[in-house]
A protein has these predicted regions:
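Bacterial N-terminal signal peptides
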Residues: 3-13
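Loop/turn elements at helix/coil->beta-strand transitions in domains of secreted/extracellular proteins
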Residues: 35-38, 67-73, 166-172, 224-229, ...
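Extracytoplasmic/secreted cell-surface and envelope-processing proteins
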Residues: 48-53, 82-86, 181-185, 237-242, ...
Length: 515
């Protein structure tokens, strides 16, 4: 397979849905005996991710022989267009020297029939030494070409099919593709004709199509079986907004705050850990968490040894969250917000809070997402007259009680850059989305201001006047509808704050931190 790359794009598309209608008459496979666990994998190549995700699916076949007595696996995957597969998988492989032109030509012929096709299958553990061709079986093709897997009915239908085909005591749902974190301008009502979402990004046509927090929750909640674990193998998804939105539909969340390598999580480790720790799910998930981040560090070290200069910026992480304790954290965080809002009326307090906001740890260069723990901790320490030591300790403990495990790459740990979870910050209800240059992140190409009332101003570097438009919704119709905001009233601070937060991420600016 071609060497792993970082991907966290934000473009998508519209297709025909993969539902139980005329376009998808396929019946479930003959159900197997009930297992302890069933892994339900749901993904899309996202133009640039086919190589990595195909390897992930191959890894499902590499578990220990005995593991499959305890763990069953069902999968649905949509391939990118053959043009994207050629450009981002085959041509890049030739350019990087990881495959020959002859091999690329051979793979092109093999993969061309999978152009924008969706496959659905159950992993057969009797297949030894599985290779790419096991995923190119035309019998696996499901539904019409170019179907929309970002449709809520498609995901619900897949879960219902998979849980019938692979009955188990416990279910783990994996959603794999590009991720965009939480952004209000993506969080439009999923009932609307032009649906837009922030997970499972498609890249073929316009208008854009992908899951939002609300549409993903809706799809999962309508399924016949409850998911014990939801794992989003996608960038930027470990934010408090998504955690609260999904807390009532699953017991555990596996999410990453920063970017996720194209290689994805260690799926073989997931299969084996679930089998070896069948009676202790938290142990299994924690071990999987550790194995995945260690794999990413190992990949980065190998790439650095091969001369890849960017490999030293190996900023990856994974967190397993225990959702049953989020309500208790939300109660404490509401008190934090109540006092923050009241304290801001005092000029001395305001100056201290503004200084903290100005230097808040930004997770991603583009998005308005910041380290929730670092931000809250800095404020409680700076304002002992507002937050006594006992409250600060209670707030921290309530958050820690939600953590099953958390691992960060060596680069993040060695430079003290780890982040527990992100949260959105805004200025008087308006938030900023930046466009930093991909090749040189110190160059700002422009930025957008999304106003609470739906107005949008787009500023392009070098131009004097902004382009004024709308973003098709408002903060009251998006952020204020989130479970997190209803529990904590965080939007009160988004409206009240007058200080622009830090504009770039110390992790993504590629400055020589600590060197």
């Amino acid at each position: 397979m071609v060497a792993a790359i970082l991907c966290c794009a934000m473009t998508t598309t519209v297709f025909t849905a993969c539902t139980d209608n005329d376009d998808n008459p396929a019946d479930p496979d003959t159900p197997t005996a009930q297992a302890e666990y069933a892994i339900l994998f749901y993904g899309y190549g996202g133009s640039t991710l086919d190589e990595g995700i195909m390897q992930n699916m191959i890894d499902f076949y590499k578990g220990k022989a005995g593991s499959y007595n305890q763990v069953k696996i069902a999968a649905q995957y949509k391939y990118s267009s053959i043009e994207d597969i050629k450009e981002y998988m085959l041509d890049e492989g030739v350019a990087n020297g990881t495959i020959t032109q002859e091999k690329a030509d051979e793979l092109y012929v093999q993969m061309k029939p999978m152009d924008l096709q969706t496959i659905r299958f159950i992993v057969d553990p009797t297949i030894n030494n599985a290779k790419d061709d096991v995923l190119l079986n035309p019998e696996y093709i499901y539904g019409e070409r170019n179907c929309d897997i970002a449709n809520v009915d498609s995901l619900t239908n897949f879960i219902n099919w998979a849980t019938e085909a692979c009955p188990a005591k416990h279910y783990i749902l994996i959603a794999s593709d590009h991720g965009g974190g939480y952004l209000p301008h993506y969080e439009r009502p999923f009932e609307a004709p032009a649906q837009t979402r922030a997970l499972i990004f498609d890249h073929t046509d316009k208008p854009l199509m992908y899951f939002t927090a609300s549409s993903f929750k809706y799809a999962v909640s309508r399924a016949n079986k409850r998911m014990d674990v939801i794992y989003m193998d996608a960038c930027l998804m470990n934010n408090i907004e998504y955690q609260f939105e999904l807390k009532d539909v699953t017991d555990y969340l596996i999410l990453s705050t920063f970017l996720v390598p194209n290689a994805g999580g260690s799926y073989t480790a997931l299969v084996d850990e679930l089998a070896q720790n069948a009676a202790n799910l938290e142990t299994a998930l924690s071990n999987f968490n550790k194995a995945s981040v260690e794999k990413w560090d190992q990949d980065a070290a190998e790439q650095a040894a091969a001369g890849n200069e960017d490999a030293k910026w190996d900023y990856h992480d994974m967190t397993v969250t225990r959702t049953r304790n989020l309500d208790a954290f939300g109660s404490k965080f509401k008190v934090f917000v109540d006092r923050l809002v009241a304290a801001y009326a005092d000029e001395d307090n305001k100056a201290k809070i503004d200084a903290i906001t100005k230097s808040a740890f930004k997770v991603n260069n583009d998005c308005p997402s910041y380290d929730i723990v670092d931000y809250a901790q800095a404020i409680t320490l700076m304002l002992p007259n507002v937050y006594d030591a006992a409250f600060a300790n209670e707030l921290g403990t309530s958050f820690n009680n939600c953590l099953v495990s958390q691992y960060c790459s060596d680069f993040l740990m060695n430079n003290n850059l780890s982040v527990d979870c992100s949260i959105m910050l805004a200025v008087q209800g308006n938030y900023y989305y930046y466009d930093y240059d991909d090749d040189d992140p110190k160059i700002l190409n422009g930025y957008d201001i999304y106003y609470a009332d739906g107005k949008r101003e787009s500023y392009i570097t070098g131009e004097t006047e902004p382009i004024v438009s709308t973003w098709s919704s408002t903060l009251p119709n998006t952020y204020e509808q989130l479970a997190f905001d209803k529990a904590t009233g965080w939007s009160r601070w988004l409206y009240l704050n007058e200080q622009l937060p830090c504009e770039n991420s110390p992790v993504e600016m590629h400055y020589p931190i600590g060197n």
